[in-house]
Amino acid sequence: MAAKSDGAAASASPDPEGAAGGARGSAGGRGEAAAAAGPPGVVGAGGPGPRYELRDCCWVLCALLVFFSDGATDLWLAASYYLQNQHTYFSLTLLFVLLPSLVVQLLSFRWFVYDYSEPAGSPGPAVSTKDSVAGGAAISTKDSAGAFRTKEGSPEPGPQPAPSSASAYRRRCCRLCIWLLQTLVHLLQLGQVWRYLRALYLGLQSRWRGERLRRHFYWQMLFESADVSMLRLLETFLRSAPQLVLQLSLLVHRGGAPDLLPALSTSASLVSLAWTLASYQKVLRDSRDDKRPLSYKGAVAQVLWHLFSIAARGLAFALFASVYKLYFGIFIVAHWCVMTFWVIQGETDFCMSKWEEIIYNMVVGIIYIFCWFNVKEGRSRRRMTLYHCIVLLENAALTGFWYSSRNFSTDFYSLIMVCVVASSFALGIFFMCVYYCLLHPNGPMLGPQAPGCIFRKASEPCGPPADAITSPPRSLPRTTGAERDGASAGERAGTPTPPVFQVRPGLPPTPVARTLRTEGPVIRIDLPRKKYPAWDAHFIDRRLRKTILALEYSSPATPRLQYRSVGTSQELLEYETTV
């Protein structure tokens, strides 16, 4: 059997491949998962794995502080506008707070409904553990009512006894309380706060529990962190980004020394944008074991990079919008359309359906209005350089148009604003270079390096060997008589002849960023793995996630995830004749 992510039955069988190839991976859509067991008695094979540390807890607490400061300053500023009878500014400020929050809370509650809902006719996914013929532990789950499937001759506890009326009543009461609590939390617009606190709780539980439960809680913590990082990314660019431009425009329009409250709101929005981008990239790298994790030094460098880059971008927008409001709207729409089509042309692979992918590309187009956001696997140096050149030209043009409308012969304030935009953009580029040259997880990325290499010190060259066959033969020339006689003489003399069939060497394997487990149970997913910077499928597809968690919790040892290898299906294409 196979465990489908849409709720079908899931089971495990002994891994025919043994312990080979066991990296946890991800797929590009809904797929099938099966869990197979390794050697009997192996618990937590492959080492202790990652651990939740104190600095991880501090990072979550800082994220909560940024979240509350951003929302509180915006609401405080809206109330101030209302008390000053500035109803237009009050309406715009409150609109940029409430509308994105409602969208994000609806999405978060939709995820909760699916995560805590149960299939009709079943109290929950039934999970059993049994001994396979090969001596390993096999796992089986079913989402429909009924008994477990068993193998002949294997000890099986049989159908689970029906729960008593008291336990069923307590279970219903508990579920009702959870639903009421989650409904209240999302009505109060605190769904992300709940997810932050739950990620913190799961991380602490993974630190305090035993080895098997530690891995289980750590997986759940990664899932929760991924959810809240995606929600925060969506909310900040729908709320904090327009709020930043609005308040900066009002400050520029008024001139003089800025008031304290608008300055606090602008600073909080700017920090929220920079923090969310860095936190998103950190959680994304932490969730993939084929990538090195992002250190906190690198995350801080990313915060400073985005902080100064977005500050320069937002200030250029505010200067231009304070004079040319209509043209600013046209510019924003045109820039968003161009960037969205650029992202679509890149053929991203992020979501599970075509329409979700289009919506995701539209959101990325909004992000590209303000800053760089990598969405395509591979070397992004050229794309990033092109984007920053475009942003530099746009910032210079927007600031230049605003400066030309001022009386620059007597207005020293205008010259200061131009210098602030230029210096802020330069600082952003500086911290970006610091990150890529010193703090990138894969090592220096902007220095001289061999094409195709990931690490500076490689044990072998990254290119194919000199004797590798790089292209198939275009024709097979007819063997001449002299060649036939020479070959016969060589065979009679005992000269070794070259093999008729040779396997063309493939690409060299990518150095593994972390120590991967090669023992114990394995959950196989019959789909190719998504390429970075996309999320793994079990982070996006919630049905696949539920199935994996059920298999993982029922296993006596912590399983590892294994996705289908892309090269396996084209194995026959690697053979060529050398007649």
From Swiss-Prot:
Q: By its UniProt entry, which InterPro entries does this protein fall under?
A: XK-rel (IPR018629), XK-related_scramblase (IPR050895)
> Pfam families, from UniProt?
XK-related
Cell membrane as UniProt keyword? yes
Keyword tags: Cell membrane, Membrane, Transmembrane, Transmembrane helix
Mark out the compositionally biased spans (Low complexity).
1-18
Q: What is its main location?
A: membrane
- Regions of biased composition (Gly residues) lie at 19-31
| Region entry Disordered, spans | 1-40, 146-165, 466-510
Membrane-crossing residue ranges in chain numbering: 59-79, 89-109, 260-280, 314-334, 355-375, 384-404, 415-435
Top-rank taxon:
Eukaryota
Q: Which GO terms describe its cellular component?
A: plasma membrane
Membrane topology field: Multi-pass membrane protein
| Similarity annotation | Belongs to the XK family.
Protein name as it appears in the record: XK-related protein 7
Organism in which the protein naturally occurs: Homo sapiens
